A protein has these predicted regions:
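N-terminal amphipathic/basic-hydrophobic helices that include classical n-h-c signal peptides
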Residues: 1-19, 413-416
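Auxiliary alpha/beta "docking" domains used to position bulky ligands
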Residues: 16-213, 261
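Iron-sulfur cluster-binding cysteine motifs and their immediate structural context
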Residues: 46, 219-243, 263-288, 349
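Loop-centered beta-sheet repeat module
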Residues: 195-237
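Glycine-rich phosphate/pyrophosphate-binding loop
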Residues: 293-332, 336
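Amphipathic alpha-helical scaffolding segments comprising HEAT/armadillo-like alpha-solenoid repeats
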Residues: 312-316, 342-355, 375-387, 411-417
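Alpha-helix N-cap/helix-start positions at coil->helix boundaries
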Residues: 324, 328, 344, 358-361, ...
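Structural detector for internal amphipathic alpha-helices that build alpha-solenoid repeat scaffolds
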Residues: 331-343, 363-375, 395-409
């Protein structure tokens, strides 16, 4: 959002000239401005501060184009926008002269022992919605910069919400280097941090580009559950669990569901195995990102499967990142997790989803989960649903689930004979 913040009250006509003359249009000393920025940003709680010019992010644009052409953006239309737009800060603000990149840790600690019957949540989503939290801090920071530097500042402030290659800008600003998992890695903080930006119409002394290397380490590539990391720094979103459970609005491909495991929202595997995170991950000092401020590290699957209305969903998850996939998307995810965990206590809730939920997406994935869990109650519900289901996609899932449940029952019978 483009905004102007005036720390002064509206002046009377007689004082306009005095206040206007007190505010310059230009920063006098870019180096001093950089020092002031560092001081103010760190006081706001940002652990990483960097600056780069507002020119095109050429290298990042080239990589993005190759990724787009390979079809790896999946259904994320916003990532298929023209590279010329995504790689140029001045397309967002014509008067731009500097891009300030800031990093704030969201690392809440290690995942606790698996909650029985729980679906895992990626760490960035344990607390409050970072868009809402960081946006307000950026507003305050811009206003404080204007007051401290004594000049009017035209700025655009955002975090993960505008068409710009934010990680490329942050790398140019010295915040880190690109790891093989495509995450931006800071050698002193790891990769568990949010990136926030201020595009300013003022010249601020820039920082050197971020440097670093993964060396010979390929742990993220070899441990990705779905093999989504196709080459160093290249992630195929069509296979990525984070995409499949968050941005994806359709079904999770049947052939990938078992690889999703117990992840109900996002995935941290490629970050969990990273040596930089094992040694350097910095615990967040922002209380808004703590587990107690939001959904936490696990979702009780049977409870989530019982959410039937958007109003109930919003009441429970409003103000957190978990609203992103919507009610149907989150129940889809929890159904898959229930199936992978063979969660027998979830059978009644899954049967209810299959019989009563208004979303074909939920009914179809609930059917798959029942097929994975098996048992007489699951099989009976699937057979009854096969006679009533009107949606073709859901009916296909039910038929597949019946076959799976039947095979599972045959296996049990053979083992017992």
């Amino acid at each position: 959002m483009l905004f102007y913040l005036n720390p002064y009250p509206r002046p009377s006509p007689g004082t306009i000239g005095v206040l206007m003359s007190a505010k310059r249009n230009k920063v006098r000393d870019p180096r001093e401005a950089r020092r002031v920025l560092e001081e103010k940003a760190r006081a706001k709680g940002f652990g990483l501060v960097g600056v780069t010019g507002a020119g095109p992010l050429t290298e990042g644009g080239e990589r993005l184009m190759e990724w787009q052409e390979a079809g790896m953006a999946a259904d994320m239309g916003y990532m298929r926008r023209p590279v010329a737009l995504l790689s140029n800060p001045r397309r967002l603000q014509k008067s731009a002269r500097s891009v300030v990149s800031l990093g704030v840790s969201y690392y809440p600690g290690e995942h606790p022992e698996n909650l029985e019957g729980g679906g895992r949540v990626a760490r960035y989503a344990w607390g409050m919605d970072y868009h809402l939290v960081i946006k307000e801090r950026l507003r305050e920071l811009r206003a404080e910069l204007e007051e401290a530097l004594g000049c009017r500042i035209r700025a655009r402030a955002f975090t993960d919400a505008v068409p710009l290659l934010e990680r490329s800008a942050a790398q140019h600003a010295g915040l880190g280097f690109f790891g093989r998992n495509s995450c931006l890695i800071n050698q002193n903080m790891g990769s568990y941090f949010f990136i926030a930006d201020l595009i300013l119409d003022q010249e601020i002394e820039p920082d050197a580009h971020g440097t670093g290397t993964c060396g010979k380490c390929t742990r993220c590539m070899s441990t990705c559950p779905t093999g989504a990391i196709k080459a160093p720094g290249v992630v195929d979103a069509r296979l990525c669990i984070s995409y499949l459970t968050i941005e994806n609005t359709g079904e999770i491909p049947r052939e990938l569901r078992r690889a999703v495991g117990d992840w109900a929202f996002g995935c941290d595997v490629c970050q969990e195995v990273c040596p930089y995170n094992k040694r350097k991950a910095t615990r967040s000092r922002w209380p808004e990102f703590s587990a107690g401020s939001g959904a936490g590290p696990y979702l009780k699957i049977t409870e989530i499967l019982g959410i039937r209305t958007d109003e109930e969903f919003e009441e429970r998850f409003g103000g957190t990142p978990l609203t992103r996939p919507g009610r149907s998307g989150l129940l889809r995810n929890c159904s898959v997790a229930a199936g992978n965990l063979r969660l027998k206590e979830a059978v009644p809730a899954l049967v209810c989803c299959l019989q009563e939920d208004g979303s074909p997406l939920v009914r179809g994935h609930a059917a798959w989960a029942l097929g994975e869990i098996g048992g007489s109650a699951a099989e009976t519900a699937l057979r009854e649903a096969s006679e009533k289901e009107a949606d073709g996609g859901s009916l296909s899932e039910i038929e597949h689930a019946l076959e799976a449940a039947s095979r599972r029952q045959e296996g049990v019978s053979e083992a017992g004979s």
